[in-house]
């Protein structure tokens, strides 16, 4: 398990030497990444100082108060100004002065981030470190394995980024599960072929959407995040709508942190983004949809070279959530789907906790944040990166954040069973949250044998946050989608998440039309009143830790092999399908009763 331990150390700044502490330190370079060369001192680098937020020890209790049905304050969500009042950020005065003393003048503020540009030589001295270039496949990134900050700033700074977070390698322009289909005729709204391909009509049947018609003017809105140079395509959505007789609807786009909306089929990466928007529209049409395209490098810095495409592959969660939190509630969708994640242990713990707290603040504002649980089952790497090379199950972040709703996957049709690639398990960073204590205890007490628990306990943390929370169809049969004007079949939990987002958007639509608040942070409600609105999945299992990457089918170099590693789908909550798949009509009646 990766941890961010504090050590005593020496910080060298340009102004004067100062004693400091090693703030974050990796025991080893993350799996798959290799050192290419040390960066030249004249190379440019852009970094962000994440200022500490105060009173975060009260975040969970406030979420409990507002998100637990039956409480007097249930659903009385906060707005932007309330968050800034209750959870203010530390002053940036000392941080900016520290940067100025080092000769850094290109500085700007974005939410609780202080962004700056400098040379590698200055950054190396400022943080008592050595920035180098590392490569993983097509990705090359400028990173370090540890850095220090002055003692006097430890209460003001959460972390510096990007430093020790390597993220994932560059992804292909199509999702790993995408397979091209022959040209197909325009489809009538029929579910006769659902055993072969999943279409919008199939989703109506599978999740009991009935004849419910959302009102585009109700105020319910749905969003999705795009990273790694992805952008959804307007023309492809129009083709998809025509194919399935969906009335014409487009989506809006907001660019964050240098994101680019590339509508050129020849150059765009659109596989994931198209999957998101097409499935959201398939479920929740005509509710407004917005795509948040987040780039990987701050755009504010003058006279500094932009990073190359190969340097722009991390999911910049900090910039993403800081941007969202900077907007008033009236300018935000009430449910946001995200289909990107990393092995939890590859995300430095400071960074993971910072991002998770930002997601919690979103929940306080009545925003439901969803995350696909991942497509690697119990795990792919299955080897610790703390220097001990210990075999272990591999949970995925941000799905392990207790303030997010993680969406796992099912397969097959009528009935659905657990998908073997649905990621799930237990976090090594976050403890089990209050809302799922009883459900997870029931699973461990009644559906896992003592021998299995004893065997698995050396590979997983049964006291950690358990995920996923819910699930929806992922693969086999595939979803039918449109990419670059052509028909493809695709899927994964990256499909399950936007499907569930569309359903949450419709539940918000029903509540808003009834004069009620949006659902906001969903998990306390899911594990109590809404549990009966899900169809329990009790067949199938997830697998992994067999030395093969289930997304690519290729061997994992240095991957851990754990015999018999799997999670079974069981009655009640389980770490493959969570509470099960949604029954919209049941859920609608339940949320309207609150």
Locate predicted features.
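Non-catalytic alpha/beta scaffold blocks inside enzyme catalytic domains
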Residues: 401-436
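Short glycine/serine- and small hydrophobic-enriched flexible loop segments
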Residues: 501-509
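Acidic/polar loop patches that form or flank catalytic/metal-binding clefts of enzymes
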Residues: 249-252, 370-371, 406-409, 414-420, ...
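Substrate-binding/charge-relay-adjacent region of secreted/lumenal peptidase catalytic domains
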Residues: 21-108, 115, 120-372, 376-406, ...
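An often Trp-containing, charged/polar helix-loop segment at the C-terminal end
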Residues: 508-575
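Fungal secretory targeting signals
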Residues: 1-20, 280
């Amino acid at each position: 398990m990766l941890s961010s331990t504090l050590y005593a150390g020496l910080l060298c700044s340009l102004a004067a030497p100062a004693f400091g502490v090693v703030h974050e330190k990796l025991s080893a370079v993350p799996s798959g990444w290799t050192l290419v060369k040390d960066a030249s001192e004249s190379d440019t680098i852009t970094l962000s100082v994440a200022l500490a937020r105060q009173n975060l020890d009260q975040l969970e209790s406030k979420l409990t108060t507002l998100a637990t049905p039956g409480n007097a304050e249930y659903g009385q969500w906060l707005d932007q100004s309330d968050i800034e009042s209750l959870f203010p950020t530390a002053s940036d005065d000392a941080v900016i002065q520290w940067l100025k003393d080092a000769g850094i003048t290109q500085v700007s503020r974005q939410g609780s981030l202080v962004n700056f540009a400098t040379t590698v030589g200055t950054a190396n001295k400022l943080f008592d470190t050595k920035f180098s270039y590392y490569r993983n496949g097509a990705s090359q990134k400028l990173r370090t394995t540890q850095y220090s900050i002055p003692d006097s700033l430890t209460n003001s700074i959460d972390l510096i980024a990007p430093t020790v977070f390597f993220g994932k390698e560059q992804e292909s322009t199509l999702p790993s599960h995408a397979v091209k289909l022959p040209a197909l005729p325009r489809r009538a709204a029929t579910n006769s072929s659902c055993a072969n391909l999943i279409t919008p009509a199939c989703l109506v049947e599978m999740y009991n959407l009935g004849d419910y018609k959302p009102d585009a003017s109700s105020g319910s809105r749905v969003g999705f995040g795009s990273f790694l140079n992805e952008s959804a395509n307007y023309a492809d959505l129009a083709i998809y709508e025509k194919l399935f007789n969906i009335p014409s609807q487009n989506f809006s786009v907001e660019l964050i942190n240098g994101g680019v909306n590339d509508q050129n089929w020849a150059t765009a990466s659109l596989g994931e983004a198209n999957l998101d928007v097409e499935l959201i529209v398939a479920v929740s049409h005509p509710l407004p949809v917005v795509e948040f395209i987040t780039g990987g490098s701050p755009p504010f810095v003058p006279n500094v070279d932009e990073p190359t495409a190969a340097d722009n592959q991390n999911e910049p969660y900090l910039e993403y959530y800081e941007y969202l939190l900077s907007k008033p509630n009236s300018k935000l969708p009430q449910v946001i789907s995200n289909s990107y994640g990393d092995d939890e242990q590859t995300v430095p713990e400071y960074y993971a906790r910072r991002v998770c707290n930002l997601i919690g603040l979103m929940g306080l504002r009545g925003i439901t944040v969803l995350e696909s649980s991942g497509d690697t089952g119990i795990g792919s790497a299955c080897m610790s990166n703390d220097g001990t090379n210990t075999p272990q199950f591999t949970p995925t972040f941000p799905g392990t954040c207790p303030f997010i709703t993680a969406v796992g996957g099912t397969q097959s049709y009528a009935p659905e069973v657990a998908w073997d690639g649905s990621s799930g398990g237990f976090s090594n960073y976050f403890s089990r949250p209050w809302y799922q204590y009883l459900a997870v205890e029931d699973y461990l007490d009644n559906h896992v044998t003592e021998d299995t628990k004893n065997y698995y306990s050396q590979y997983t943390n049964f006291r950690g946050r358990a995920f996923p929370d819910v699930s929806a169809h992922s693969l086999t049969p595939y979803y039918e989608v449109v990419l670059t004007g052509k028909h493809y079949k695709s899927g994964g939990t990256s499909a399950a998440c936007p499907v569930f987002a569309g359903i949450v958007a419709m539940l918000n639509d029903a509540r808003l039309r009834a004069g009620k608040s949006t659902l906001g942070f969903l998990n306390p409600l899911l594990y109590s009143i809404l549990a009966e609105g899900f169809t329990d999945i009790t067949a199938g299992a997830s697998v992994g830790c067999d030395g093969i990457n289930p997304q690519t089918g290729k061997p994992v170099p240095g991957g851990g092999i754990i015999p018999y590693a799997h999670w079974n789908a069981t009655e009640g909550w389980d770490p493959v399908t969570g509470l099960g798949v949604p029954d919209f009509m049941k859920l609608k009646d339940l949320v309207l009763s609150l």
